[in-house]
Amino acid sequence: ALSSAASDVYKRQDLCVIQFSSGSTGAPKGVMLSFNNILTNLKIKTLADEITTEDTLIHWMPYFHDYGLFGNHLVCLYNQITEIKIEPFSFLRDPLIFLKKIGFER
């Protein structure tokens, strides 16, 4: 449920963001996502991935990519868990940095 302060600012059906498709099969298209769309997605991902407050998420996806933003960053904020982000170019230069970072963070 929305807090009373949040519900004064926006309604669940209000437009939250326009997410552009990659355009891999044509011109990129803007997809209108409501607050409800995003909150529902976050809830489903939380349940499907069995995320708990004890979890830490490590990833290298940029925030301009939909999964980097919605599937990683916002999931961490929504669940109030630790997010460790590896810069994408660092990962591309040295993919083993991912495993090194996991070892370091344990």
Residue ranges of each PLM-predicted region?
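AMP-binding (ANL) adenylation modules
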Residues: 61-65
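Single conserved hydrophobic/aromatic residue that forms the stacking wall/gate
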Residues: 1-10
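Short secondary-structure boundary/capping segments
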Residues: 9, 27, 34, 73-79
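Conserved AMP-binding/adenylation subdomain of ANL enzymes
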Residues: 39-56, 66-106
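Conserved AMP-binding A3 loop
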Residues: 16-40
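Short, well-ordered beta-strand segments
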Residues: 16, 56-58
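Conserved sugar-transfer catalytic core signal across GT-A, GT-B, and GT-C glycosyltransferases
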Residues: 5, 17, 72
